[in-house]
């Protein structure tokens, strides 16, 4: 959807190799979940096959359709309740600009406190990722 100016906000970490069906089954998400939520927050509706073979349609054209949240129960159930065959998703417009910031901290606690302070001031970053020394060394190897 990028050529049309839209994107799928949950941004699963495995986005290069995953499928929407897998995202729905696992309730996947990545670094953007802090601001935009997980897959369950972007699934408007599904067509699914129940274990007995019945075809069901859950959800509707808007998020938070009235009634029991069977859709919410299905998303993330890892295929134990049904197999999703179609999904209607909420897409977001791509932002006009993106700013990336890299900051170093003396400890994980200090980094966590900085993130808390930023969010406490009403700024919710689109994504936050943290790597400790061991992870950085592994990534650089």
Where are these predicted regions, by residue range?
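Glycine-/charge-enriched secondary-structure boundary and capping motifs
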Residues: 129-141
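FAD-binding subdomain of flavoenzyme oxidoreductases
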Residues: 1-131
């Amino acid at each position: 959807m990028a050529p049309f100016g839209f994107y799928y906000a949950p941004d699963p970490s495995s986005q290069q190799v995953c499928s929407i069906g897998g995202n729905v089954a696992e309730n996947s998400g990545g670094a953007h979940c802090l601001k935009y939520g997980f897959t369950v927050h972007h699934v408007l509706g599904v067509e699914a096959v129940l274990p007995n073979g019945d075809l069901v349609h859950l959800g509707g054209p808007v998020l938070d359709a009235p009634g029991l949240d069977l859709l919410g129960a299905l998303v993330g159930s890892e295929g134990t309740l049904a197999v999703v065959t179609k999904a209607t998703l909420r897409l977001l417009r791509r932002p006009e600009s993106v700013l990336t910031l890299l900051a170093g901290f003396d400890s994980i606690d200090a980094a966590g406190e900085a993130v808390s302070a930023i969010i406490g001031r009403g700024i919710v970053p689109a994504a936050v990722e943290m790597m400790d020394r061991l992870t950085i060394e592994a990534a650089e190897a």
